[in-house]
């Protein structure tokens, strides 16, 4: 039976290869670690592998199956162009009509010394086109007007700043020392004029403080009395249901019943009964009360 290519995809073939090697290892070794086993014995067989295997051959497509009309008819190749209008090869030169591999050795002789100027000009043109500024970075031309600065006309004169003169002085600022007239005696520099601080335009409002509440005033909040802490009544718990015996209580009750010769109780709140004690005699108490009231004289 001739060989046929596998019908599975690449992930399927990889999975089947891994499963085959895994089960092959499990057939003769029971360590359970296939990868660790290979890593442990790999250093011992580094030089025994031999030369590397040859690269896999290219797989060619299988011929198409024959249809009802016989084998498929392939179109004949295009005829070569007539005349000397054949496409030039990349190898260039006079031997362009020869074998296609003949121009590989003459790749260095493709351009002559007379073509260097054209190559440098083309490279410079490409460099200039690459460095040309784009449309978004174009400088502003003379015909384009700049944006005007927004200026607001104040409706009311500005108020002077507190604690000194205004920020901008009305007098122009000097940038150089004035020239001295000929024959004039130098005078002492006048003392710096200090401008007193401008008084406040309005009187400050008085600070309002909360009036102190009297000691016996009824407007004071009542004192807070915290509720007493809750203390559970351990001796007489206020529960509707009777407390049941635990395992330890049952054992203690059995020991007490055997010690005092009495029956066991079912609930801890029940009173114990002692049948061997003498019964209390039943007595009927009868008495007569007589009194006499005397009126005051």
Curated annotation (Swiss-Prot):
Q: Where is the composition biased (Basic residues)?
A: 137-151
**Which stretches are tagged as biased composition: Pro residues?**
65-81, 219-229
* One Pfam short name: TT_ORF2-like
Which residue ranges are recorded for the region named Disordered?
Answer: 46-229
What name goes with this protein?
A: Uncharacterized ORF2/4 protein
Source organism per entry reads: Torque teno virus (isolate Human/China/CT23F/2001) (TTV)
Q: Where is the composition biased (Acidic residues)?
A: 106-117
In which residue ranges is the amino acid composition biased (Low complexity)? 184-201
Per UniProt, the ranges with Gly residues bias are 90-100
* InterPro entries, sorted: HEV_TT_vir_Orf2/Gyrovir_Vp2_N
